């Protein structure tokens, strides 16, 4: 069922919005109605309590969070109380999402400012700045000289900002933190790292900073709420709005420290599994791949804008290259690639062209998976299984990224196992099954980084630093002996094969104080974060010296001058490989070799694995003992077509696969 929305128009909408009249008027001129999630979120946010918003893609979550913050800043400007200080901190797990949010904020800020000027109010500009690893040094320096009112960053850059001396001072005035796509970081070490950084922000400001979490897919939602607010034993208010509800009253606000706005994750979706003409096997043949490229190209031509997701950067380059060959008749540069090993310039260009419709199709990895505005994409293709239910929902939700739209997704199976997995995924999505999020308990490597960073900025009482760490939800059960052991290791140094490593802390065991040694701050800034280091070589285009992207170290050292490689859907001829750098020149479309990157493919989640096992068991049950398959007449075939988005050929191949496995093994493997 689709989530229903409040239908408020004109004066009735104006009066319903809890904003300054100019801000409210801007909203009514831009939108015909406010969504249900927005009408519930705004009073909750303006109450000052922590808020977690869980809603489908395209339901207006980001605007729900930001418009209240913009209204607060605007009203300060009206009262001549707006200072040149950072009050709103927005954290997203992707640099692409950070850049996109900045662009999407510039327009409302500009239009609200123009509306104020038209009303006779000359107000200071509300400034928004992005600070990530891609931010040029000049912009970083300008930000320190004149802090933005809204700062957009990533978890890793927030850690650096908290640790560097000058930027740290800028964060003392933060009053609201917005964590977008919180489900993407909560179940891994990046989440633990961010949770500690949020507690350091709260400690730095000396006040209770309001926290707003945004996510599209979460289960259990109470765990994510606790992750957001930290270890304060919150009593969670569940403002659940079921998708089947015809209408809902605005959320009743209570005195609880965290409010959950949950309008569910289920939407009507147009889902199907695409099966190649040749019969699928254990591995994909060249003929199968060729048929997949042909079918994707045909779908691209039949739609205005298409987003193709793959699971690896190598496959992104490969698919974009072969689609380019098949779609050349549509014009030049109608296909673009997008992944984390491309330069910022190339990624931003692909994002802009996708949003404006300048390209017909973009082939991407997880780099475009989260809430970036992808414009009017009306089809998402997934090559192979996305390996998790949440990822499948998130990626397919990129299509129809506007209110009331029905996302359209096509999953392309490349093997028999992927056929079953894709069918199980569609069945799970239709049934409302979600992956379960589990927060990793107290990763000590992350704890050590944050202790060094915190001690590098000021002297700490041991007990106070221990309490700060335990306020972060992943460390709520951290015992004192473990904390002391980590501190001792950092203060005494640790033994390696080359001898004892350097110590980062001064530990006063008499007065129980901790402070950083010389070099601790630099070590924290240069070595912090939970994203694994990779030995990549920068790819530099000559003669202008433009950075095109990066390739894996092993690929770089195996390459020779004169080789042609593909990066960003462009052929490059290698001129030379040096220390950490690969110099290239435009190869003018010559046939290329596709680079590889190590350690890319995602693992399958436990929930999707359970759905795969359940589907196999259900097919076996419907076949009946000893029943043979003949010309698609087996009972499960029609059931698979209705339940799992398979066509006749795909359903028949799925049944044949189960029968063949049972004939060899004597039983259908399940999790029982």
Region roles according to the model:
Residues 2-3, 8, 243:
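Cysteine-centered motifs
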Residues 13-15, 19-25, 33, 39, ...:
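Helicase motor core with emphasis on the C-terminal RecA-like subdomain
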Residues 30:
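Detector for the N-terminal beta1/A-loop initiation region of ABC nucleotide-binding domains
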Residues 56:
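Walker A (P-loop) phosphate-binding loop of ABC-type ATPase nucleotide-binding domains
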Residues 59-60:
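ATP-binding Walker
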Residues 290-295, 299, 354-355, 359-361, ...:
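Phosphate-interacting basic helix/loop segments used at nucleotide- and nucleic-acid interfaces
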Residues 431, 577-671:
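Terminal, basic amphipathic appendages of nucleotide-handling enzymes
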Residues 492, 497-614, 626:
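Conserved nucleotide-binding/hydrolysis modules and their immediate coupling elements
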């Amino acid at each position: 069922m689709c989530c229903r929305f409040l239908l408020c128009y004109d004066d009735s909408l104006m009066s319903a919005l809890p904003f300054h009249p100019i801000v409210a008027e801007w909203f009514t001129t831009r939108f015909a109605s406010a969504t249900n999630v927005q009408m519930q979120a705004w009073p909750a946010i303006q109450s000052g309590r922590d808020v977690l918003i869980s809603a489908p893609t395209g339901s207006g979550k980001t605007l729900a969070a930001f418009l209240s913050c913009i209204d607060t800043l605007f009203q300060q400007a009206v009262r001549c109380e707006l200072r040149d200080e950072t009050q709103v901190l927005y954290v997203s797990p992707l640099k692409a999402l950070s850049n996109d949010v900045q662009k999407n904020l510039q327009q409302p800020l500009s239009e609200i400012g123009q509306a104020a000027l038209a009303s006779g109010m000359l107000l200071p500009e509300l400034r928004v700045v992005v600070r990530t690893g891609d931010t040029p040094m000049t912009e970083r320096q300008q930000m320190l000289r004149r802090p933005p009112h809204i700062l957009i960053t990533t978890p890793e850059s927030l850690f650096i900002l908290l640790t560097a001396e000058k930027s740290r001072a800028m964060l003392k005035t933060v009053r609201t933190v917005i964590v977008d796509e919180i489900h993407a970081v909560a179940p891994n070490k990046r989440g633990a790292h961010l949770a500690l950084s949020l507690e350091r922000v709260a400690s730095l400001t000396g006040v209770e900073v309001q926290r707003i979490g945004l996510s599209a897919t979460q289960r259990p939602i109470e765990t994510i709420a606790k992750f957001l607010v930290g270890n304060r034993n919150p009593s969670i208010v569940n403002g659940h709005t079921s998708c089947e509800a015809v209408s809902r009253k605005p959320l009743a606000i209570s005195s609880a420290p965290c409010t959950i706005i949950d309008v569910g994750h289920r939407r009507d979706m147009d889902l199907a599994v695409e099966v190649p003409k040749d019969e699928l096997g254990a591995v994909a043949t060249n003929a199968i791949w060729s048929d997949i490229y042909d079918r994707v190209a045909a779908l691209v031509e039949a739609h205005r804008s298409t987003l193709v997701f793959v699971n690896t950067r190598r496959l992104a380059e490969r698919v974009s290259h072969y689609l380019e060959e098949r779609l050349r008749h549509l014009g030049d540069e109608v296909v673009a690639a997008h992944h984390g090993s491309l330069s910022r310039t190339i990624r931003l260009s692909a994002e802009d062209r996708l949003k404006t419709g300048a390209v017909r199709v973009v082939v991407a990895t997880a780099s475009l998976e989260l809430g970036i505005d992808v414009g009017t994409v009306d089809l998402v293709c997934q090559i192979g299984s996305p390996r998790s239910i949440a990822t499948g929902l998130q990626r397919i939700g990129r299509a129809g990224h506007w209110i009331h739209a029905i996302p359209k997704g096509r999953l392309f199976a490349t093997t028999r196992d992927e056929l079953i997995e894709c069918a199980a995924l569609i069945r799970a999505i239709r049934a409302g099954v979600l992956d379960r999020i589990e927060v990793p308990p107290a990763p000590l490597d992350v704890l050590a980084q944050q202790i060094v960073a915190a001690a590098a900025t000021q002297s700490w009482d041991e007990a106070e630093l221990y309490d700060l760490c335990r306020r972060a939800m992943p460390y709520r059960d951290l015992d004192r002996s473990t904390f002391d052991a980590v501190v001792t290791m950092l203060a005494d140094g640790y033994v390696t094969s080359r001898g004892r490593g350097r110590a980062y802390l001064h530990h006063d065991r008499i007065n129980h104080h901790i402070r950083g040694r010389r070099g601790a701050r630099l070590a924290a800034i240069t070595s912090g974060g939970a994203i694994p280091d990779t030995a990549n070589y920068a790819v530099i285009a000559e003669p202008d010296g433009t950075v095109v992207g990066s390739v894996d170290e092993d690929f770089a050292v195996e390459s020779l001058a004169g080789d042609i490689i593909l990066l960003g859907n462009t052929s490059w001829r290698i001129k030379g490989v040096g220390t950490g750098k690969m110099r290239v020149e435009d190869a003018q479309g010559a046939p290329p070799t596709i680079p590889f990157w190590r350690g890319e493919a995602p693992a399958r989640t436990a929930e999707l694995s359970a759905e795969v096992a359940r589907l196999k068991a259900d097919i076996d049950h419907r076949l009946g003992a000893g029943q043979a398959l003949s010309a698609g007449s087996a009972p499960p075939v029609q059931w698979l077509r209705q339940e799992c988005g398979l066509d006749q050929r795909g359903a028949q191949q799925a049944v044949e696969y189960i029968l063949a496995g049972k004939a060899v093994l004597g039983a259908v493997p399940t999790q029982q």
